[in-house]
Each structure stands twice: as structure tokens, then as C-alpha cells.
Amino acid sequence: MQPRVLLIAALLALLATAAEDKDASLLDVVQGYMQQASKTAKDTLTSMQESQVAQQARDWVNDGLSSLKDYWGKLKGKFSSFWDSTFEDTTPSPAVA
């Protein structure tokens, strides 16, 4: 074989190998990017779900406290009228001379 043919064959082999490495490298970069994008989307979705769960928990607690305050207000109203009438009955009347 002539040296030119060997040189051309070697250059073609190097170019083919370099192109293959470049494609593999590009594929790795794209895969890494997609994995990162997928992880970011998953983290965002999880954060939103946790936020929704936390909001539901806060609403539940607030509703419970509101109901408790209403119940306490009604109970207090009933007993305050009871206590007021009890204290009026037991208040000593002024001495009549």
C-alpha cells in the first residue's frame, strides 16, 4: 500500500472515532440535562403537594379552633347567665333597722 492510502485510512479512522466520542459525549450531556430537569420537576411537584397538605392541615386546625371558640363562647354565655343569677340571689340585702 502506498503511504498516502495508509495516512488517509488512519485519518478516517480517527475522524470516525472522534465523531463517535462526540456523539456519546453529547448523549451524556443530554441525558444529564434530562435527569436534572426531571429531578427539578419532581422536587417542585413534591414541594407543591407538601404545601397543599400543609395548607389543608392549617385549615383543619383553624376550623377546629374556630369551632372550639364558638363552643366556648356558647358555654360561657350559658354559665355566665347562671352565675349572674346565682350571685344576685346570694347577695346579702342591706340591714333594715
Swiss-Prot record:
Q: Where is the signal peptide?
A: 1-18
Q: Name one GO cellular component term.
A: spherical high-density lipoprotein particle
InterPro entries the UniProt entry points to: Apo-CIII (IPR008403), Apo_CIII_sf (IPR038195)
Q: Pinpoint the site May interact with the LDL receptor.
A: K39
Give the subcellular location: Secreted
Q: Which Gene3D superfamilies match?
A: Apolipoprotein CIII (6.10.90.10)
Q: Region labeled Lipid-binding — which residues? A: 66-97
Carries keyword Signal?
Answer: yes
Highest taxon in the source lineage: Eukaryota
Q: Which keywords does this chain's UniProt record carry? A: Chylomicron, Glycoprotein, Lipid degradation, Lipid metabolism, Lipid transport, Secreted, Sialic acid, Signal, Transport, VLDL
Main subcellular location of this protein, as a coarse class: secreted
Q: Which GO terms describe its molecular function?
A: high-density lipoprotein particle receptor binding; lipase inhibitor activity; phospholipid binding
Primary role: Component of triglyceride-rich very low density lipoproteins (VLDL) and high density lipoproteins (HDL) in plasma. Plays a multifaceted role in triglyceride homeostasis. Intracellularly, promotes hepatic very low density lipoprotein 1 (VLDL1) assembly and secretion; extracellularly, attenuates hydrolysis and clearance of triglyceride-rich lipoproteins (TRLs). Impairs the lipolysis of TRLs by inhibiting lipoprotein lipase and the hepatic uptake of TRLs by remnant receptors.
**Similarity field:** Belongs to the apolipoprotein C3 family.
Q: Which PANTHER family match?
A: APOLIPOPROTEIN C-III
Protein name, as recorded? Apolipoprotein C-III
Q: Which organism is it from?
A: Equus caballus
Taxonomic path: Eukaryota, Metazoa, Chordata, Craniata, Vertebrata
Question: What gene is behind this protein?
Answer: APOC3
